[in-house]
Amino acid sequence: MKSASNKLLPALFCLLLVARLQAAEEPKLSPLPAPVSNNAVAISHDQGRARIFSFMGIGPKKTWDAITTSAYEMDPGTGKWTEKRPVPGVAGRLAASAVALHDQVFIFGGYVVDAQSGETTVSDLNVFVPVENRYYRGQDIPVPVDDAVVGLYRDRYIFLIGGWSTSKDDAVSNVQVYDTDKDTWMQATPIPGTPVFGHAGAIIGDTIVYVDGAYKNPSGPNPKYVASSECWMGKIPKKGDITKIEWTKLPAHPGNARYRIAAGAGPLGKKADRIYFSGGTDIPYNYDGIGYNGQPAEPSPVTFAFNDYTGKWETVSEDTPEPTMDHRGLLVTRRGLIVVGGMEKGQQVTAKVTVIKPVSRK
């Protein structure tokens, strides 16, 4: 008579074989065709097919003329990138935001830089139609912003939260809501905390969460901007007027206050819905990675999450391999958390596509 352990061996072998086959079936995600940082990223699941997009950003020189209009699309099924038609405009942009919805990608704002290092926030809303490789213009953003937080609600409304606006010469508290069905804008309840730019966050269910960012130094011009440690949660009404947001201050998240963290929302396997945050730096800086205080910014290795079910912070990793900063988003997929491009240690612009496998612990 066979022992219980012997009976289990075939089943264990089958499980291991299936796991190995699944791993073998998933191709490695190729680096971007060119190194880029501060690029707007999005993921589409139209018709059950995942597609990853990267728009604009800055190249390795980190100068005004290294800002690009380039656009790329990846099929995770092959792990390969395809170059797409460049984003319209006379110049590339930094600090834009992107959201994919159905068969389109909406690209909001950002700023352009001239040869004298002058920066101008743009009001552009460009909508990319991947299957046709074309763009069309949506209704301009009422208050132009860059370095804002963006989130999708009910597969229809896109929230643009805070950010910097050169028209105001400051960060703004506006929460602007774009109706993708009607191509119209609404103004929602402003953020009650310090207006910030370079903050990070997303929407999960009817919950907005954003953290950190930078703001003008109230003590003077040295440094010009300092990091914010504020964390906020906004509740969007399930019924009635979606612009009436109820804001609540959250306790501090794991790790230091940071700037330009990669953030994104979604379920991961059987885990409850979470908003994930990874990388970023505790030194606010301009587009070259050198802090407003004159010190070089370096990426944080901390990855953490907000659990929408418990309403609590979770530490995912205090030592994320090859951490990066200078991000405009993070993509939550069945593979893990995908980070596209960014700046590595030493302010080096990278083409890498990194997959972070989270194992949450409190």
Q: Which residues does each predicted region cover?
A:
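Bacterial N-terminal signal peptides
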Residues: 10-20
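Kelch-like beta-propeller repeat domains
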Residues: 23-362
